[in-house]
């Protein structure tokens, strides 16, 4: 059971090297969940964004992949391999130093993250969106979050 969940949202300016200062809700949760001071960053299964989580969450992801493999193996065994590649092969590590990370270039490119990243807690992980993509293509709640943070950033 995960005791400390990622709950909250925030926006971060992304520098030219992909560096960003994590919002307080992410920094606080990481410090409670892991002494590793790093995040694993991978591609979201269905949305055009990234997911970030501490190394201890990998076992939860593995259990979910296995549960779904068993449930879907008669329908399409290929689904499992695609899901497993995305969950475990399309992942990179980012060190957390002084509350900052550098998004790996491959991950930034995959999610088209440019100058402003929207981070949204999803319980065991954090979704990382390009704020403009979230505004233009997200569901109603995501659109509202992105609009709020973009407006706030522009007013600053």
Residue ranges of model-derived segments:
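Acidic (E/D-rich), amphipathic helical modules within compact regulatory domains
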Residues: 25-70
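Short, structured motif recognition centered on aromatic/hydrophobic residues
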Residues: 18-22, 26, 52, 99-103, ...
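Short solvent-exposed loop/turn micro-motifs enriched in small/polar/acidic residues
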Residues: 4-6, 34, 87, 111-112
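A short beta-strand-loop micro-motif that forms or neighbors metal/cofactor-
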Residues: 32-47, 109-134
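Glycine-rich, aromatic-bearing surface loops/beta-hairpins
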Residues: 124-156
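The feature marks the first
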Residues: 1-32
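Short, solvent-exposed interaction modules
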Residues: 55, 60-61, 66-101, 106-108, ...
């Amino acid at each position: 059971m995960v005791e400390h969940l990622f709950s909250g949202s925030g926006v971060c300016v992304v520098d030219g090297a992909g560096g960003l200062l994590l919002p307080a809700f992410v920094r606080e949760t990481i410090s409670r969940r892991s002494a590793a001071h790093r995040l694993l960053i991978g591609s979201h299964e269905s949305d055009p964004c990234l997911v970030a989580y501490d190394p201890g969450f990998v076992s939860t992801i593995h259990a979910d992949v296995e549960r779904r493999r068993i449930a879907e193996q008669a329908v399409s065994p290929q689904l499992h391999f695609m899901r497993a590649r995305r969950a475990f092969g399309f992942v990179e590590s980012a060190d957390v130093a002084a509350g900052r990370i550098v998004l790996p270039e491959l991950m930034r490119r995959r999610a088209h993250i440019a100058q402003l990243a929207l981070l949204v807690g999803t319980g065991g992980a954090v979704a990382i969106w390009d704020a403009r993509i979230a505004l233009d293509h997200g569901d109603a709640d995501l659109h509202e979050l992105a609009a709020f943070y973009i407006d706030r950033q522009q007013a600053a």
